[in-house]
Amino acid sequence: SRRASEEEARRLADIDHLTGCYNRRSFTAALGDLLTHLERREQALAAIAVDLDNFKQVNDLHGHQAGDEVLRNTAARIQRLLPDGGILARLGGDEFICVVPYHPKVPDRVDQLATRMIEHVARPVEYGDTPVDVTMSIGIASSTQMENARDGEDAAERLMHKSDIAMYHAKKQGKNRFYWFEPQMENELRFRNELEAGIRRGIANGEFRPYYEQQIDLESGKLVGFEMLARWESPEMGVVGPDIFIPIAEEIGVIGEMSEALIACAFEDAKEWDAELTLSVNISPVQMRDPWFAQKLLKLLVRHNFPACRLDIEITESCLHENVGMVRSMISSLRNQGVRVSLDDFGTGYSSLSQL
């Protein structure tokens, strides 16, 4: 009948086709209803945001069908653990969220559930003959942390947002763990987002500047060159040190662009020095994952007409373990052009020099 087919159409619009869970739209509506009818003293709701760690690697290594199998498995494992009245949704990609009722005086129940979810999802998923491993990060937010919890879908969105912020915090703390939402997490996240946006702007506006530290030969006491360091002269934040902006630039994928601009400036500066002095530059392990890194660097040397023999590239030991073949061929092509390549880990790395 027409009515039955309309209901079926509505049901299909409300579920995630891959896992059979709710989707974002139907979950938000259901959570809104639950919040509206909550008896505040006797009941609370915990929104539990779940995100798989390094899921992209599963797709890259094993293909999308393996990824889909992991998502279906994850949904089934979480669903089995949920108490009565719990609802699970897949929000998209590898993001899930569930809501569970609990007594506000017994939040440990929710802790236990989160711990079990993490344990169950970490068990390998069999895909063909290959066991596929994933872990997950969880953020939890409680209806007790909200004003105006009865605003239906609006309150649902706010509660979901809080659980998402806590989940992001769990990722930052090293993944494979859970955190309850705390208000300062919101400020940390806002600051982090401002930093990211500032770094992107700063690269475009040339706010990252090289400065130099002397390198002295310990035996002769003679100045042999300068090491290039970087600082960010930010109009909003003043001078920011590399310990803050380098890790973020690596994470958001702009370290290569930033480093090339700094090196280009440094080549121009170093042309003014005595021709005996070398320029030493630290290269991030993230840059060494770019198969074109050596080509880009050699191009910069030519463009700025800077002698390769005056350039000393310092890489860290960890670069060598990630992709020995590619790193080795990049180092060879740099050395063939006369660039010095040294390992910078203060004595720990020399065992790996033999690999080169």
Model feature map: region roles:
Residues 37, 80-85, 106, 117-131, ...:
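Short catalytic/binding micro-motifs of nucleotide second-messenger systems
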Residues 89-91, 106-108, 121-137, 152, ...:
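Catalytic core regions of nucleotide second-messenger enzymes
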Residues 184-187, 194-306, 316-319, 326, ...:
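Bacterial c-di-GMP phosphodiesterase EAL domain
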Residues 88, 116, 126, 130, ...:
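Cyclic nucleotide signaling catalytic output domains
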Residues 10-14, 20-46, 53-83, 89-93, ...:
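Conserved long alpha-helical elements within nucleotide-processing catalytic cores of c-di-GMP signaling
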Residues 70, 97-119, 140, 147-152, ...:
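Short helix/loop segment flanking the catalytic signature motif in cyclic-nucleotide metabolism enzymes
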